[in-house]
Amino acid sequence: MVKVYAPASSANMSVGFDVLGAAVTPVDGALLGDVVTVEAAETFSLNNLGRFADKLPSEPRENIVYQCWERFCQELGKQIPVAMTLEKNMPIGSGLGSSACSVVAALMAMNEHCGKPLNDTRLLALMGELEGRISGSIHYDNVAPCFLGGMQLMIEENDIISQQVPGFDEWLWVLAYPGIKVSTAEARAILPAQYRRQDCIAHGRHLAGFIHACYSRQPELAANLMKDVIAEPYRERLLPGFRQARQAVAEIGAVASGISGSGPTLFALCDKPDTAQRVADWLGKNYLQNQEGFVHICRLDTAGARVLEN
């Protein structure tokens, strides 16, 4: 039996639309991510467990884990009879890389079960392909950090899909999921087809400056450059209370905040534990919409997807 855990991730990070993402893990030791188990069997089967299992498609072939198994078998050119179990701990349409968690855990578990026939680059390419079936287009800003860990910059040149960018140990990521769903496809459809020249220049300056600040170890500069002129101005209308929440967390002391992925999760970066706790408390009382919502104080998950049992 192989059991693989794949962590949540926060894509875009305001400054890097479709090209930046960070894997995150709660500081209290909770597992914020999906788990997939693969066991040898006579025929294929898929079982769904976990807090959000009831949100998965009722038709098994529509389940992305089934599609991962099917695509992996196609890649190897043979049928692989296994019993798969998806522990769905991540809310769907949350902006925390929920589909990426399932895809990464499923493909990595299959690869481990079969003795690692695929290298990491090929595996990551498959992960992007499968996640793209849900989000509507191939982009790696969730699957890459989820699989590889840390903060990842998408390269997609010279056979390099992504490379790690150094993060800041003092940064605490407060993630508030309000309990409502925003589909990635819907959030992409709301974006304009063309952008003004000054917005393109600002976006390039912010992203280049942020990467420079990460490598030159300037956390204050990096945080100040986490501005979004590409998606947030259009997507914030999908998120009730988002603008007020951003203003509130800034007043409490967050050094940066924005939409995690395509939302509705809000992320707030803090450089002090007491500030992070006060931000988390405020968001828990004011940003959550229902009982399914949650707030976690996280750090970068530098390990990425990992085998829990083998």
From Swiss-Prot:
Recorded GO MF terms: ATP binding; homoserine kinase activity
* Keywords of this entry: Amino-acid biosynthesis, ATP-binding, Cytoplasm, Kinase, Nucleotide-binding, Threonine biosynthesis, Transferase
Q: What is its EC number?
A: 2.7.1.39
Where would one find the signal peptide in this protein?
A: none
This chain belongs to which protein, by name? Homoserine kinase
Would you say which domain of life the source belongs to? Bacteria
Q: Where in the cell is it found?
A: Cytoplasm
* Catalytic reaction(s) noted: L-homoserine + ATP = O-phospho-L-homoserine + ADP + H(+)
GO BP terms in the entry: threonine biosynthetic process
* Keyword Cytoplasm found: yes
Q: Which PANTHER family match?
A: HOMOSERINE KINASE, HOMOSERINE/4-DIPHOSPHOCYTIDYL-2-C-METHYL-D-ERYTHRITOL KINASE
Q: Which organism is it from?
A: Escherichia coli O6:H1 (strain CFT073 / ATCC 700928 / UPEC)
Main subcellular localization, coarse class? cytoplasm
Task: Please give an example of a GO cellular component term from this record.
Answer: cytoplasm
Instruction: Report residues binding ATP.
Output: 91-101
Question: According to its UniProt record, which protein family does this protein belong to?
Answer: Belongs to the GHMP kinase family. Homoserine kinase subfamily.
One Pfam family name from the record? GHMP_kinases_C
InterPro entries linked to this entry: GHMP_kinase_C_dom, GHMP_kinase_C_sf, GHMP_kinase_N_dom, GHMP_knse_ATP-bd_CS, Homoserine_kinase, Ribosomal_Su5_D2-typ_SF, Ribsml_uS5_D2-typ_fold_subgr
Keyword Nucleotide-binding among record annotations: yes
Q: In which pathway does it act?
A: Amino-acid biosynthesis; L-threonine biosynthesis; L-threonine from L-aspartate: step 4/5
Q: Which PROSITE patterns match?
A: GHMP_KINASES_ATP (PS00627)
Gene expressing this chain: thrB
Write out the function statement from the record.
Catalyzes the ATP-dependent phosphorylation of L-homoserine to L-homoserine phosphate.
